[in-house]
Amino acid sequence: MKLLQMNHVQKSFNDDTLHVLKDISLSVEKGEVVAIIGPSGSGKSTLLRCAALLTDMDDGELFYGDIQAARSENGRAVYAGKETLKRVREKFGLVFQSFNLFPHYSVLKNLTDPQIRVLGRDKETAQQRARQLLEKMGLSDKEGAYP
């Protein structure tokens, strides 16, 4: 089963003068490990940002399993509704090469804040999920620590 499918993705910057992604297609199957390799400025991060719904594509299709998050219509990407995108964001994320934690937030707050702001979860649900993840990683004793 395809977990991620991107078809004919296009992305430009600077009023369409800088074409970063030109007709890029890829799929990721369940259990598959994929590496995106290329020189600096080749569009790797832009592609991942489009896949994670952090940057809008100019054109193309985007599927997460059987959920269509974006479709191509008249040469432009048209995104699904808010609720559909919210479901997708719950299942897909990425960690940047130089990610940053908020040094003035505890470990627990660093884990709960994105869930509340991005996923719209209530504080109690976000904290419960964060504690599950900390326990899974053997870091339960660090929830009150600061980075």
Task: Describe the role of every protein-language-model region.
Residues 61-87:
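ABC ATPase NBD Q-loop/coupling interface
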Residues 52:
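Helix-to-loop junction immediately C-terminal to a conserved catalytic motif
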Residues 55-64, 121:
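Conserved post-Walker A/P-loop segment of ABC ATPase nucleotide-binding domains
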